[in-house]
Amino acid sequence: MSQSTIHKIAVKKRTETGKNENNRLRSSGMIPVNIIGAGVATSGAVNEKELAKMVHSGIRQSTLIELDVEGQGQQKVFVKEIQRFPEIDRIRHVDFYKVVPGQKIVTKIGIETTGVAKGSKTGGQFEHIIHEIRVKTIPEDLLENLTIDVTDLDVGDSIKISQLKVPASWEILINGDPIVTSVNKTKALLAAERAEAKGAVPDDAKAKKGKK
């Protein structure tokens, strides 16, 4: 398991809003943001370069971010939405939502694997099917990624959602119990098994043939 990394960024409060003000902010190297929590939205602005660096570092919805808000101090948040200009790779606006300790939230958690499946060394094909899951949990138990060890997976083995080792507070929001990873027989391995089966002679048949 990979604990959620805390990223930090400063937020300058703003009282003026609207299209013209937002354009003025962007031309000065700042990006408008909203901080949402308890039904209240606070308008602010962050340094565009610092924000882009944080976003490009691979943050997810489950990444904990610490905002240093002008006049309000530090606030822990998650990213709710990142808006971009469609014609260029530039951030237009970001919505954050505040973390309330002990209050469950719904977010997405990535699934990573570690190790080399045993079955892939003997002709099997390893498959990583589900790369992300939706989870309802408390902020204190959030993970940026869930890492599963596939070293012991042999040909024909699989790991299902119900077999994942996760914090007790987690409720995985998914239908059924699908397979996350598996090691399947390749076409070559199946063909070899069929050929071997066709060429096999039962022991009693061999004995009868020897008596003739």
Swiss-Prot record:
Q: Where is the composition biased (Basic and acidic residues)?
A: 13-24
Indicate what this protein is called per its UniProt record.
Large ribosomal subunit protein bL25
In the UniProt record, the signal sequence range is none
In terms of CDD domains, this protein maps to: Ribosomal_L25_TL5_CTC
Record key words, sorted: Ribonucleoprotein, Ribosomal protein, RNA-binding, rRNA-binding
- Decide whether keyword Kinase is in the record: no
Subunit description: Part of the 50S ribosomal subunit; part of the 5S rRNA/L5/L18/L25 subcomplex. Contacts the 5S rRNA. Binds to the 5S rRNA independently of L5 and L18.
Similarity comment text for this entry: Belongs to the bacterial ribosomal protein bL25 family. CTC subfamily.
Tell me which Gene Ontology terms the entry assigns under biological process: translation
Q: Which GO terms describe its cellular component?
A: cytosolic large ribosomal subunit
UniProt KW Transport keyword:
no
Q: Which NCBIfam families match?
A: bL25_bact_ctc (TIGR00731), PRK05618.3-2 (NF004136)
Task performed by this protein: This is one of the proteins that binds to the 5S RNA in the ribosome where it forms part of the central protuberance.
User: Which residues lie within the region annotated Disordered?
Assistant: 1-25
Species whose genome carries this gene: Leptospira borgpetersenii serovar Hardjo-bovis (strain L550)
Task: Tell me which domain of life the UniProt entry assigns to the organism this sequence originates from.
Answer: Bacteria
GO: which molecular function terms? 5S rRNA binding; structural constituent of ribosome
Q: Name one Pfam family in it.
A: Ribosomal_L25p
